[in-house]
Amino acid sequence: MRPWLRMLFVSLLAFLVLAGSLAYAQEVGRIAGTVTAKRDGSPLSFANVLVMGTGLGTFVKDNGGFAIEGVPVGTYTVKVMMMGYAAETKENVVVRANSTTELAIQLSETVVVELPVTQVTAEKPIIDADKTGSRRDIDMEDTAVRSINTVEEAIAAQAGVVLEGGEIHIRGGRSGEVKQFVDGIQISDAFVGNTGLEVSLSSLSEIEVLSGGFDAEYGNVQSGIINLKTREGGPKYSGVVKYMTDDYGSPDKTYFNFDNLSLGFGGPLISRNLRFFASAEVVFSDTYLKTLEPRPQKELWGFIKFRERQTNNYSLQGKATYLFSGMKKLAVEFLGSGDKFDFYHHAFSRVGYWSDIEKHWWFEPLDSTYSLYYGPAHTPNVENNHNSIKMVWNHTLSPSTFYTMRLGRYSTLHEEVVLNKRPDEYVTPSANDRLDPENRFYVVAGDYPHWQHYESVMWTGKGDMTIQRNTTHQIKFGLETNIYQLDMTDMLYPDIDNPTGIYTDIYNFNCWQLSSFLQDRITFEGMNVRAGLRFDLFDPGRKAVESYNRYLLLTGFPGEDAGFFKRTEWQVSPRLGVSYPISERDALYFNYGRFYQIPRLEVMFQFLGQTDQGLLPFGNPLMDAETTIMYEVGVQHQFTGTLVGDVAMFYKDIFGLTGTLPGDLVEGSPFQELYGPTATPVVYTNLDYGSVRGIEFKLTKRFSRRFSGSVTYTFSKATGSSSNELQGSNVVGGGLDRAPITELPLDWDRNHVISTNLYISEPGLWGCNIDWSYSTGRPFTPVLPREREVRAALINSERLDARSTVNIKADKRWRIGGQEVSLFMEGRNVLDRRNIANLTPGSWPGGEGNYSSYYTTEKKLGGAYDEGELLGLPEVIYVPLNDPRVYSTPRNFRVGISFDW
């Protein structure tokens, strides 16, 4: 497209969106339904429908239908009144984000005397005829009775979700393809592509997981949306206190020194229109990977003494809302979380004595030249702090029109430092397999050679307007802009002789993103159609492109034009979803969409601040957006009043994923002069591709007759050209013989995943929950003895053993002073299953040359080094290292108490 046409298109689209209002209607829903006479079913036009406590309401139309737009997410009482009929109220009407709650109300006629108001308790329809894609609404009451203590654990229990190495994959996509929002503001770090901010379950009222059929309002995401709705203060004071620990009785192998305390409290403040809710949570644990690192005692407030543990996490939340009237509402919220931990590294696990003169390590000092060396203390202390502050304004202009405006700031501060040292205070670690032959693999002197500090800030402004034009069309349009500020300092091998280290990466860049959408929800004859169009524009910034030009000049090519219309990337995304109720017990849905996502900013800007990065990959700010085309069809069926099934089939075509590729080079270029005539540069580019297909099944039994439960099953195949964006770099570096020429199973591909949940309870007295999850093994690449180069044909050609976990939770409840107190016990992995987490956890910067997996030939885990090769012998002599990181968390029991009021 010509530059002037592109500018005209962007300007017109922005003007059309700004002509309305701004945002993202995500924390509001809709109440709709019919009001008829109980006697003959005739429509009762002009009946008055009110949502109590909100000031929202409407009149019934001639056909008996009504719709109330812009109802904040929550639980309400709906009252219906009409002259000549007894008023009726429906209690516990649940309104969910971006969804319609259907009500069918019948009024009885009055004759002479006035009848009392009839009260009816509403239940959420077991069939969601409004949904056009896969959506999982996670009930917070459900998580409270299960062995679920974090948002991540709640999401991992859903169909189509795989939790691998602490990263969430939805329907076979890469982990960075999942975005998380709190009340419509993104809390995913665009720099590294993950979700850093931890939100306590005690602060949440709702979790929504979208894995297919996203509306046009969702952009810059390919695989999944996680919507979190935080609690608001109610008209009365309420709160929760929960404490959990595994410190009971004598410590044994199931003891991880775990403590978890969470608090929440809210209610009216000064006036009934001003309300608040605040929560806090702390979690401390030494984990099952206990290190011997000494930790000094600290003091809090002058009298509380404690020691930090291997992992230390906290989260804070504070939210204030003011209801100006039933039509206007302002919410201001702060969210913060942090974690400080020392990761376990097997090569640094030795504690003993080192002699720099003798070049020898031993368990005790052999003479005066030996000094104490705590290996675990010389791994980095990693500290992350995440903060989000936002302001949300909701305004209902009429029963059919409302808008929402949001302004937010999200920041991440990350530090990775050994013993709080400056880079010039680092000591280069021992090259262990050469420095001390008696201690192969283990580091016995020096520091982990990595020093890192980065900060990323994202400013967000967004808004939308929703208009119910008539009973058929609901129009929604909006605009969003994000501004990113990035500051990175990353050093490898810094020390007193070279304070800046090698491969140093230092930069400061700003970039921004603009998006808008228009969608129409069409309802007619029971059918719902969601059709939308989205526009996204990304500008990496002139500074980044000019820095990238230094790389091009280094390789002998002219630089790129850094002008606005040359450096910006834009896309238009169509979305379509259809739902059709076949009967009162069946509903069919289908959706199609194109989803674009800019690569994470880390790979766009890496090493653009300087040109001395060696042969590591250059960032590329001119990369295109990654693309996913998704199709889905599903059906819901209600078997009984409490039993419902949901089946969905999906297919994803993925291309333009981030990968690495040997860069072009002009003969005699400055790059060859700097690194040698055979050196090859590596650059990030849109190289990788893949596909995912699968079927999901969920059977849910609502609570009745003292039990509830669910069964989910997912069959999927996730294949692609690469699981690792650095695969091309490995080819250049000699770690891989060639790039694969066909799609291969991805690292997180688990073909069969089953999850079951059974809850048995006597309400108000006791309860017991059992969770069982099972998945077939993930793929792995066979490693053959003394082969330094992996064969592309063998990548992920075999599979590990299946993974299985059983968790239980049992509680006993009492009513004390009218409030509920619960004592509970939680068992995790109660069968102590040894599930494989990793065949060969990283050993860098140790002697990796002789360290590898010997699972392929010996079927043993934990990694080993080949003593025969080190001694120059022809036979292979494996010396096992028994790295505990190869297994996931073993059995652990916890006890706790909670108090709700």
Predicted features and spans:
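Periplasm-facing N-terminal accessory domains of Gram-negative outer-membrane beta-barrel systems
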Residues: 23-121, 125-126, 162
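Periplasmic N-terminal accessory/gating domains of Gram-negative outer-membrane beta-barrel systems
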Residues: 86, 94-103, 116-216, 220-225, ...
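Gram-negative outer-membrane beta-barrel transporters
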Residues: 242, 650-653, 670-782
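Transmembrane beta-barrel wall of Gram-negative outer-membrane proteins
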Residues: 255-345, 381-403, 574
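Solvent-exposed loop segments that connect transmembrane elements
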Residues: 289-307, 344-379, 419-449, 493-504, ...
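Signature of Gram-negative outer-membrane beta-barrel scaffolds
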Residues: 303, 448-452, 457-460, 468, ...
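Membrane-embedded beta-barrel scaffold of Gram-negative outer-membrane proteins
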Residues: 404, 408, 587-589, 593, ...
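C-terminal beta-signal and adjacent terminal beta-strands/loops
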Residues: 765-769, 773-787, 812-901
